[in-house]
Amino acid sequence: MILTHPAFAARRAFTFLEVMIVVVILGVLAAIVIPQFGTATQDARASALKANLGGVRAAIAGYRANAVLAGSPPYPTLTELTTPNTVVQGDFPQNPYNGLATVQTVSFAQASSRAVVNATTFGWNYYVDNAATPPVAIFYANAADDAGANASGNPIRANEH
């Protein structure tokens, strides 16, 4: 004779239907939550891009102010821009869209249209002409990924900031 404890006799396993209902509920929750993480990642990259661009452009403006007072060419050359602690304090920031901290020179036409050139090799594009009247310097991201939207809801590319 096998005796069972009364507390164990009333127990039973989940049915297949109950397990499937739980799986469906988890699937619906995942479908709602996961796309929001994608948006958060895009927003974080766009914010990092704006911060990095602002930092480098502010450093270029600071260099320009000192150079004008010293009677030197107003904008840094590519070598001066990328030499640590000459224009930018510390290491050059990475482009958050391609992870590269390298800078290349581009033509005036490319800079004016914010062309993306060699995006797998360079994170940033820089055009400088100290001989122009007035002198010109254009610094922008070397990536065309979506980096937010304007007031009308139209996408803004990383190279348009």
Protein language model annotation of sequence segments:
Residues 115-161:
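Short, surface-exposed interaction loops/tails
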Residues 31, 42-80:
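Conserved hydrophobic/amphipathic alpha-helical signal-anchor segments
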Residues 1-14:
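N-terminal leader/signal peptides at the extreme start of proteins
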Residues 20-36:
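Alpha-helical hydrophobic helix detector
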